[in-house]
Curated annotation (Swiss-Prot):
Name this protein carries in UniProt: Ribosomal large subunit pseudouridine synthase B
Any one Gene Ontology BP term: enzyme-directed rRNA pseudouridine synthesis
Source species of the chain: Haemophilus influenzae (strain ATCC 51907 / DSM 11121 / KW20 / Rd)
UniProtKB keywords: Isomerase, RNA-binding, rRNA processing
Lineage: Bacteria, Pseudomonadati, Pseudomonadota, Gammaproteobacteria, Pasteurellales
Composition-biased stretches (Polar residues): 1-12, 41-54
Basic and acidic residues compositional bias, start-end: 14-32
Enzyme class (EC, first level): isomerase
Protein family membership: Belongs to the pseudouridine synthase RsuA family.
The protein's Enzyme Commission number: 5.4.99.22
Keyword Isomerase: yes
Catalytic residue list: 183
UniProt function note: Responsible for synthesis of pseudouridine from uracil-2605 in 23S ribosomal RNA.
């Protein structure tokens, strides 16, 4: 039998494995196409929604305005003006402001307030109006005072004990500001000034103004102990040390030393020695910067410093020189002798005792 003219073409034979591979590759192609399409569609919708709804787009960052571009507050800091007016050091006045004792135009002042002294603004401390008219022309005055033991470095004492301000000359329109403090059992040089800014700078640790003390200690002192005190000892308020220690005399376990500090922390000299088991039995401040306790000045006596020494202190802390003084040159040349000062101090002490009785 002859084969028919039309012969069916033979279909190629595929194995099951090859079919699976073919189907898998096709499926992957479809998936890749569909994934690309979905991403393009999503992006199109997102851009369309964002163009219609502005709240979905992230706001642009505002340009940073630097402090230098902002207008500065007019006037000077309140504590600086009041310090120059002789109402205390800047730190003392900052404490007053924080306690709500200072008001400006009837409103309680806050730290950072500024005032213009030429605007006639009314400033009160504890309800009393402060005269600011003389703050620009106040002459810087400095007193050297020999503080005796038993006096407090405060303006008033509720127990009625003597204070270092009791014997100072009276002032009108300003007041004396103590440059630092000495505890009740410490005697020696204490400076007072009418310039609050000068007092603040002289006291600030960053100025590193030297304070020298003559100290009598009770106990056995050795070289290792002195080396530790020079290097530094950890106290409860931080590391402290003596810049210089010089032996000046003594017998046995009672010895005298001159020690120098670069700051004035509370009872720092005593605490440094006590950290080594040594007791301080006598402490006298003999120098502040280059200002030495004047020989012949009795305990409880004071001496106003001349313009040269005032300007030394001002230059020491970066303040402009003073050009005026209230110290009478002729009167200064006729200064009373130490014996006269001692008699005056003794009379004052006797009168004070009778008054308290």
């Amino acid at each position: 039998m002859k084969p028919s003219q039309k012969q069916t073409q033979r279909q190629p034979h595929f194995s099951k494995d090859s079919a699976k591979k073919r189907d898998f590759s096709a499926k992957n192609d479809r998936r890749s196409v569909s994934r690309t399409a979905r991403i393009e569609t999503a992006n199109t919708k997102k851009s369309a929604v964002n163009s219609d709804n502005k709240f979905l787009s992230k706001p642009k960052a505002k340009p940073v305005v630097r402090a230098s571009n902002q207008p500065k507050a007019e006037g000077e800091k309140l504590q600086k003006v009041l310090a120059r007016a002789g109402q205390g050091s800047r730190r003392e006045i900052e404490t007053m402001i924080a306690a709500g004792r200072v008001s400006v135009e009837g409103k309680i002042a806050t730290l950072g307030d500024r005032i213009d002294v030429h605007s006639g603004v009314k400033v009160r401390i504890d309800g009393q109006i402060i005269n600011l008219s003389h703050t620009q022309k106040e002459i810087c005055r400095v007193l050297m005072y020999y503080k005796p033991e038993g006096e407090l470095c405060t303006r008033s004492d509720p127990e009625g004990r003597a204070t270092v301000f009791d014997r100072l000359p009276r002032l009108t329109g300003s007041r004396w500001i103590a440059v630092g403090r000495l505890d009740i059992n410490t005697s020696g040089l204490l400076l007072f000034t009418t310039d609050g800014e000068l007092a603040n700078r002289l006291m600030h640790p960053s100025r590193e103004v030297e304070r020298e003390y003559s100290v009598r200690v009770f106990g056995q002192v050795d070289d290792a102990m002195l080396a530790r005190l020079r290097k530094g000892v950890q106290l409860e308020d931080g590391l402290a040390n003596f810049k210089e220690i010089k032996f000046t005399g003594g017998v046995g376990i009672n010895q005298w030393y001159d020690v120098t500090l670069m700051e004035g922390r509370n009872r720092e000299v005593r605490r440094l020695w006590e950290s080594q088991g040594i007791q301080v039995s006598r402490l006298i401040r003999i120098r502040y910067g280059n200002i030495k306790l004047m020989k012949g000045l009795p305990r409880g006596g004071w001496e106003e410093m001349d313009l040269e020494n005032v300007n030394y202190l001002r230059e020491l802390v970066g303040l402009p020189a003073e050009t005026e003084t209230k110290l009478d040159v002729k009167q200064a040349s006729r200064r009373p002798k130490s014996g006269q000062i001692r008699k005056a101090v003794k009379r004052y002490s006797e009168m004070n005792k009778r008054y308290k009785k």
